[in-house]
Amino acid sequence: MSKYISEQFRKYVAERANFQCEYCHIYQEDAFFPFHIDHIISLKHGGLTILENLAYTCSFCNSFKGTDVGTILFPKQKFIRLFNPRKDSWSAHLEIDDFVFYALTDIGAATIKVLNLNEVDRIIERRTIARN
């Protein structure tokens, strides 16, 4: 299937997410850079350009995620998939306290790792947004 995402799909995905990144939960209006439509399972891995495989993402989450679908977690040395906004409950895998993300599951840990959710600059960004 084509990697082209129609304007109709883009609008639907953004509205479905309430204009909020489906990974880090930052709102589009608070972000400096434009948001993206992400293939949850990338085309490279056989994902399709269908609504069930599209997520609304901030530029940082989209960039860090790339075509990844998971990662190896140590010390278990086990492949763990990333959080899937269409199939998973965010609060079942992740929580945030004082602008820092905490994993509740291996899926949460994999997502924090790959998306660099606790990178210092990202924590500072969340704190700055909260003050405004």
Q: Where in this protein do the model-derived segments appear?
A:
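Histidine- and/or cysteine-centered catalytic micro-motif in compact active-site loops
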Residues: 26-27, 40
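Short edge-strand/loop segments of extracellular domains
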Residues: 40, 45, 74-76
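A positional/architectural concept
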Residues: 18, 25-26
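Short beta-strand-alpha-helix junction that forms the catalytic/metal-binding core
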Residues: 21, 45-65
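Histidine-centered catalytic micro-motifs used for acid/base chemistry in nuclease
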Residues: 36-42, 58
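Extended charged
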Residues: 1-8, 12, 27-30, 63-132
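Short, flexible, mixed-charge glycine/proline-rich loop motifs
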Residues: 8-16, 47-52
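A short coil-to-beta-strand element that immediately follows conserved catalytic motifs
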Residues: 31-35
